[in-house]
Amino acid sequence: KKLLIIPIIIFLCFIAQIFYMGHINESFFYNLTQTQNPYYEIKNINFHKGFLNSKADFTIEDKYNLGLISKLDFKFNNNYFSKFIAQGKLSNPFKLLDDKLQNKELAWFKIQSIQNDLNVSIQFQDINLSNEGGNALWENVLTEILLDKEDLKIKAIYSKIGQVDFSQFYAKFYLKNLDHQQKFEKPISFSNLIQFNESVEEFKFDFCEINNHTISSFYNKNIIYFDDDNQTLKMHSQGKANNLNIDLTSQIYQSIDFDQINFDLIYSQKKPDISDDKLIFKPSNEELNLQIQNITLKKDNQDINIKGNIFLSRQSHKAHIQISSLKSPDEIFTWGQFFGGLNQYFIKNEEGMFIMDLHYDSDAKTQLKINGNEFTDINLN
């Protein structure tokens, strides 16, 4: 009899956790559907509780009368030991893609429990609209969202795109192996996702082409935070681009290329808010400031360094930028000969550095000065 008690207890515990997980999954689903969002509305909520599995669904409709409607179907696993809490699919809201998508499904998703968090993995279907007029292609698109289990707020988001190719006639955009991730200082709601939030953001890709302008690889890290008693938004941006080629053959009969570009920038503005009607970001005082800590352009084993500051507002524009190089600008940029040479805008200091010191002030009588000398009186407003 004692031997029979052990399997009975195990069986009862298994049944108990099934009922418990069924209750947890139902609570999670209804908490998810109660989420308020200014961009879409959740309708037609259904939950069908089962023993080992529960099924649920709801529809999402946009609030801008665009006719975008998508249905989310869930299959919950009422077993604590299942790898995934739920799996499901997202129907396609764009009618023009119906013929290109298997079962008219835009994406599939899986929800997995990770300690106190939930990881939502969304795999999108590949889309290929290529025809005689051009290409419209995206492949291997994946998004993962890390949610706080308690209030379903976003702690981090990660996206990956294997390939994007849009080309029509003479216009072309191609991107390969894009990775983007953002970790938030504090968990945020879905409705705040497009706002400025304190976070660390990383962005990289292997190759990009825009109308014959190419970059072989790119990496960027942004630290976004608020300063001055939470009233000023700042973004510290650092990164590099390799093998940049700008096709200017139609303008100066050749391309401008750099082996590498390193940058260190700080962008700041007064904390933006959202207008009540359009939900669009607006700087509160329309003042923007860009500090160029350093930009280094590398070409043929030579460095061109750029530092300075740019200030923009509705009332005035100001800029102070210094460009320096050990090598003569005309030797680095041979295309300058078409404009009388670039050396004329530089002075050579005692250390042998070629320097351009540029000042611009929209309020001054002489708006633009190069190396202290008046350049022109044109108005750049």
Regions found by a protein language model. Give the residues of each.
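Glycine-rich, small/hydroxylated-residue low-complexity segments
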Residues: 13-15, 19-381
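Hydrophobic membrane-insertion alpha-helices, especially the h-region
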Residues: 2-18
